Structures are given as C-alpha cells and as structure tokens.
UniProtKB/Swiss-Prot annotation:
Keyword Metal-binding among UniProt keywords: yes
Protein name, entry field: DNA-binding protein creA
Secretion signal span: none
First and last residues of each zinc finger (C2H2-type): 64-86, 92-116
SUBUNIT field: Interacts with creB.
Keyword Transcription: yes
Keywords from the named record: DNA-binding, Metal-binding, Nucleus, Repeat, Repressor, Transcription, Transcription regulation, Ubl conjugation, Zinc, Zinc-finger
Main subcellular localisation: nucleus
Organism of this sequence: Emericella nidulans (strain FGSC A4 / ATCC 38163 / CBS 112.46 / NRRL 194 / M139) (Aspergillus nidulans)
Gene: creA
Bias type Basic residues, positions: 230-242
GO terms for cellular component: cytoplasm; nucleus
Length: 416
C-alpha cells in the first residue's frame, strides 16, 4: 500500500501547491511580460495593462460633470475639452503664416504644427505650398484693392489745387521740399490742363514741346491781362526769351490761379506789388493779396517769397541783376525737387556780383605766355567795402535797389 499512500501524499501535497501556484504563475507571467517588454514587447503589455488602469480609475470620483450630457470627468481640463465638442469652439489657431486651421485641443495643434516644422514631410510641403499660394493671393487682392482705392481717391484732391489757391502745404521759396520730379510733372500737367489735354493722359513725364507751345500761345493772347504794355513787355518778352521753361511754368501756374481770383485782386496788385514778407517766415501771415515772387508771374496768396530787394525784377528788369538768384528760387511755388530737370542753362556765369568789373588777365592769357615764371595766377583783389555800407540796407548789399524799406520795416507798416 505504499503506492496509494505515496499517491495520496503526493496528491495532498499537489493540492496546496496547485492552489498556491496560480498566483505564482500569474506573478511569473507578469515578470516574464516585464522582461519581454525590454525586448520590444511594450505595446502588447500596455494594451493589456490599460483595462486594469481604467478599472482602477473607474473607482475614482468624477466631480466634473458635463452640463450638456451625462458624462463626468476626473479633471477640469477634460471637462472643458469635452464641452468644446458640443459648442464647436476651436481656440487653438495655427500660427504658421498662411495657415488658417484651428483646433479645439492643444495636442491636435501640436500634432498639426509638426507638419509645418518637418521639411521632409510630403504633406507638410504640400501644405506649405498651399499656404504660400493662399497668402500670395490674399496679398494680391489687398494690393489691387488698395490700388483701386488710391486710384479712385487721387482725382478729387487734385481739383482744388488746380482751380484755386487755398492755404495749402506749398513750401516757402527758400525751402525746396525733397519731392520727386514725377510729382512736379504731375502738378504741372494739372495746371496746364485747360490748354494741353493730351498731356493729362500721360502716365509719367511731360511733353516739353507741348507745354512750350501751349504757354506761348496763351502768352500772346492774354499777355495784357495782368500788366500794362510796357510792364508786360519787360516781364514777358525778355524774360521768356532768356529764361525759357521756368517762366513758362510760372505763367502756367499764374494763369490757373488767376482764374479763381476776381478783378479786384488783379487791380489791387498795383498798390501791393512791392509788399514783401519777413525773411524767416515759412508761410505768409498777411491777407491773401496777390504778391508776386522773384521769377514767377502768379499771385500766390498762400505764401510770399523772401525779401530780395537787390534782385527784384520789377526794379530793373533789363539789368543783369536778374541772374543773382539761382533758378530754383522761382521754381518753388509748388512741389519741386532740389534740382529740377527742366531747369534751363543760365546765360552767364556772373552769379556773384555783376557790378564788379573784370580785373586782371584771363586764364587763357596766362597760359599762353611764353615764360614759365609769368604763368601764375594773380592774387585775387577783394573789394574794399566799408562796414557802414555793409550794415546799411541801401548800401553795398542793395546796389540796384531803389527802395530801402522793403526788407522788413516798411512792408510791415503797410500790412498792418
């Protein structure tokens, strides 16, 4: 009977071993699964362990309940994210230029941003191309809309500038604003619009021949509308013959401005034609009486030029003192560049003081001398002028002037 006893004893021994072997086998299986996780078997273990974790979390309280449905959540951010599924809110917008996608979850935005940040992704390249094309199309639409708005808004401001002479932003004659010549040409084209309609349709630049023809024709027809016979002969004839284009442009502005003034303004010119403004004032503070500048024929009520008694063309219009000032001074009635391309060449180099006689031999005479010792420039002779003559307004500084009170004294008394 040893076999049955041994068998019974063996079976008794196996029963408790079988009962205790079940958790041991489970622990061994868990240990083997843990060891196998190091051998790239981690996803099956996680999938197998996820239900256990979810079962463990099922026991936790869910205080955050959705007000729109029966779902409850452990954390507040989970409830907020769930509510966005009902409302359709997408607060997370893609910051990539040209991309207009929005997401309700931050992790979706992070996943989407990898498409733009990964240059090797085909989808990312396609999305970038589409985004760039959309951005370019939007920019083109905005540019065309701005161009249309600018084109529709450009003609109205030019009309009051052409027809009348308001208190505008025209600079003073001693300051040349740094505008381009295209603005100068457009302004001139608008001033000559009644006489040269074809130049108004040009996109850029100006036909000088057309301007000269139109201005010369108007000069012949209406030259006696501003001055008497002798005065118009002095102002129009010799100055147009010697100066050319600046006088034509000045006449064009004067004619366009004079249409907005009555005959009373033209008659009052005879009494106020010597009136000047203070030297340092950028704009005129006097009433809008037609005061004439240095080399223009237009009444300019918006500003008056600097006081230049020695260079006044009305005092001695035929004397060489007309060439004292550069031609930019009389081209600054409107927006002119610092050096206008339409500036004609001067008649002579005597810009300094034409009253001084030429003393000493010329350079050609010095260079033609045979001896080398005689080929030397003479010492320049400085004219001896007394201090009283320099300080006196009617002295050396205003040789050709016939009025001494036209700088800042007498004109202020007349003005007030």
């Amino acid at each position: 009977m040893p076999q049955p006893g041994s068998s019974v004893d063996f079976s008794n021994l196996l029963n408790p071993q079988n009962n205790t072997a079940i958790p041991a086998e489970v622990s061994n299986a868990t240990a083997s699964a843990t060891m196998a996780s190091g051998a790239s078997l981690l996803p099956p273990m996680v999938k197998g362990a996820r239900p256990a974790a979810e079962e463990a979390r099922q026991d936790l309280p869910r205080p955050y309940k959705c007000p729109l449905c029966e779902r409850a959540f452990h954390r507040l951010e989970h409830q907020t994210r769930h509510i966005r599924t009902h409302t359709g809110e997408k607060p997370h917008a893609c910051q990539f230029p040209g991309c207009s996608k929005r997401f309700s979850r931050s992790d979706e935005l992070t996943r989407h941003s990898r498409i733009h940040n990964n240059p090797n992704s085909r989808r990312g390249n396609k999305a970038q191309h589409l985004a760039a094309a959309a951005a370019a199309a939007a920019a083109n639409q905005d540019g065309s809309a701005m161009a249309n708005n600018a084109g529709s808004m450009m003609p109205p401001p030019s009309k009051p500038i052409t027809r009348s002479a308001p208190v505008s932003q025209v600079g003073s004659p001693d300051i040349s604003p740094p505008h381009s010549f295209s603005n100068y040409a457009n302004h001139m084209r608008s001033n000559l619009s009644p006489y040269s309609r074809t130049s108004e349709r040009a996109s850029s630049g100006m036909d000088i021949n057309l301007l000269a023809t139109a201005a010369s024709q108007v000069e012949r027809d209406e030259s006696f509308g501003f001055r008497s016979g002798q005065r118009s002969h002095h102002m129009y004839g010799p100055r147009h013959g010697s100066r050319g284009l600046p006088s034509l442009s000045a006449y064009a502005i004067s004619h366009s401005m004079s249409r907005s003034h009555s005959h009373e303004d033209e008659d009052s010119y005879a009494s106020h034609r010597v009136k000047r403004s203070r030297p340092n004032s950028p704009n005129s503070t006097a009433p809008s009486s037609p005061t004439f500048s240095h080399d223009s024929l237009s009444p300019t009520p918006d500003h008056t030029p600097l006081a230049t008694p020695a260079h006044s063309p009305r005092l001695k219009p035929l004397s060489p003192s007309e060439l004292h000032l550069p031609s930019i001074r009389h081209l600054s009635l409107h927006h002119t560049p610092a050096l206008a391309p339409m500036e004609p060449q001067a008649e002579g180099p005597n810009y300094y003081n034409p009253n001084q006689p030429h003393v000493g031999p010329s350079i050609s005479d010095i260079m033609s001398r045979p001896e080398g010792a005689q080929r030397k420039l003479p010492i320049p002779q400085v004219p001896k002028v007394a201090v009283q003559d320099m300080l006196n307004p009617s002295g050396f500084t205003s040789v050709s002037s016939s009025t001494a009170n036209s700088v800042a004294g007498g004109d202020l008394a007349e003005r007030f």
